[in-house]
Amino acid sequence: MAISDLLNRRVRARPEDDEVYSEASGSDEGSQDGSDAESNGSIHSQEDDSDAEGDGDDTDADSQSEASNSDIEEEPESEHDDGDDFKASLADISFGALAKAQASMREKNRKDKRTPKDDTASSTVDDIRTKLREAREQKLEAAAKSKSKEKKSRSSKHAPMELSSKRAVTRKRTAVELPPAPRSRDPRFDAAVMGHSGVGKHPHGGKAYAFLDEYRASELNDLKEQMRKTKNLQQKEKLKGEIRRMQDKLRSAQNKKREAEVQAEHKKREKQLIREGKKANPYYLKNSELQKQVLERKYGEMGSRERAKALERRRRKMASKERKEMPWERRGAGGDEDGGAPNGGKRRRLE
């Protein structure tokens, strides 16, 4: 049995302090410690066919070999006994002990093959990944800030507006420039005649179409003749409305013409005074002064009877306007506090 103990001692790998075993080796070591504790240093030489009992024998043999190293070296034995003991020890070795030794050797070789280059390479890869992650986060934060940032206002309203050049090019392209479509040109709304504002303030616009006033006057005479001849009341009312509208148009056109004449004369007079050196700055008419001069010109163009009728109409118009603006009161001597008559009298205007 001394040879078997010696073989087990040589096959068994002595664990190092910094060696890391696998789970299987750890479980084997735990079972070995438990068996040593139960045996309390006793030596068992029984043989079993099961793997669990073989593991127990191996642990017992290991402990026995460690305890009797000095005894084996001191006792001389014969060659015949050595051969028998060697065969017996080979038969006593279990598969669990062999697997345990193989696992410990594999772990040791794997640890030896591990070089610092792998550690440096893995650390370099980790650093690169960390930097890429940080750069990606910074880019996302910058994009979010740029979206939330408000548009910068211009330094002044006359400064050019800033527009982004990152715009998608449209797929629609104009290969050949087509000639513009012909448009109808109405001289009544032409800028050369009506002025750039389009409100008929051009000085030559009225002169170019002065003949239209003659047409309107002739149309007005025709409508009056039709109203005089017709006997249908509905048709007569309709013609009367048309005549009234045309008269209003002619009257407004004449008033505009008078205003333009008054303005032209005033400007001409002011320019003459400035040219003579009597005035340094021109005087611009107020609207009230302009209307007053227009009325004077209007009444000056009328005859005596027509002027009297016009003045009478204007007097009645102004009187009715003033009467509407006057306050009202109830008739009766004893009125209520709110001004109402006790017997429901009519209201009258204050004189």
From Swiss-Prot:
Subcellular locations according to the entry: Nucleus, Nucleolus
Q: Where is the composition biased (Basic residues)?
A: 146-157
Basic and acidic residues bias spans: 105-144, 296-311, 319-334
The region called Disordered is annotated at: 1-205, 248-279, 296-351
Question: Which InterPro entries does this one have?
Answer: RRP36 (IPR009292)
Disulphide bonds in the chain: none
Q: Which UniProt keywords apply?
A: Coiled coil, Nucleus, Ribonucleoprotein, Ribosome biogenesis, rRNA processing
Feature: compositional bias, Low complexity? 22-39
Might you report a single GO cellular component term? 90S preribosome
Q: Name one GO biological process term.
A: maturation of SSU-rRNA from tricistronic rRNA transcript (SSU-rRNA, 5.8S rRNA, LSU-rRNA)
Q: Which residues lie in Acidic residues bias regions? A: 48-63, 71-84
Query: Which sequence ranges form a coiled-coil region, renumbered to this chain?
Result: 119-152, 216-276
Superkingdom field: Eukaryota
Cited Pfam families: RRP36 (PF06102)
Q: What does this protein do?
A: Component of the 90S pre-ribosome involved in the maturation of rRNAs. Required for early cleavages of the pre-RNAs in the 40S ribosomal subunit maturation pathway.
Summary of subunit composition and partner proteins: Associates with 90S and pre-40S pre-ribosomal particles.
**The family this protein is said to belong to:** Belongs to the RRP36 family.
This protein's name = rRNA biogenesis protein rrp36
Species of the source? Penicillium rubens (strain ATCC 28089 / DSM 1075 / NRRL 1951 / Wisconsin 54-1255) (Penicillium chrysogenum)
Gene that codes for this? rrp36
